[in-house]
């Protein structure tokens, strides 16, 4: 039996209606547009997911996708709460999914997003 939990994540990564889905028995977190990557990535990886997403965000903010991802004062807390679920799989919508310690990748993503969007705030001024 599968048990799914809907987790509202307003404005993470986009609009007020954003949400993640967590399957409790397999510990799979469906992460929507978090961890987006481009190109032709492998279907599943076991390391480096947050690093790939960080690089994508840096490129995206210099392209027509600038400002498409939101990071606000509640975003880090939302990512920390998702990490507390202890996901073993991160099911990614646009890029490689991840098998392993998903909590670490979520926390690394929070730091990566802070890095990208603090730089953007300085640029936008």
Feature annotation, model-predicted:
Residues 10-101, 111-114:
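Metallo-beta-lactamase
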Residues 99-100, 104-125:
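C-terminal regulatory/interaction regions
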């Amino acid at each position: 039996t599968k048990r799914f939990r809907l987790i509202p994540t307003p404005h993470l990564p986009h609009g007020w209606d954003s949400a993640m889905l967590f399957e409790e028995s397999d510990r799979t977190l469906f992460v929507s547009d978090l961890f987006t990557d481009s190109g032709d990535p492998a279907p599943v990886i076991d390391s480096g997911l947050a690093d790939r997403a960080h690089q994508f965000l840096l490129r995206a903010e210099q392209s027509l996708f600038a400002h498409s991802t939101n990071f606000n004062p509640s975003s880090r807390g939302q990512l920390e709460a998702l990490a507390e679920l202890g996901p073993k799989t991160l099911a990614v919508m646009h890029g490689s999914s991840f098998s392993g310690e998903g909590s670490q990748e979520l926390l690394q993503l929070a730091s990566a997003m802070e890095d990208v969007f603090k730089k953007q705030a300085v640029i936008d001024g």
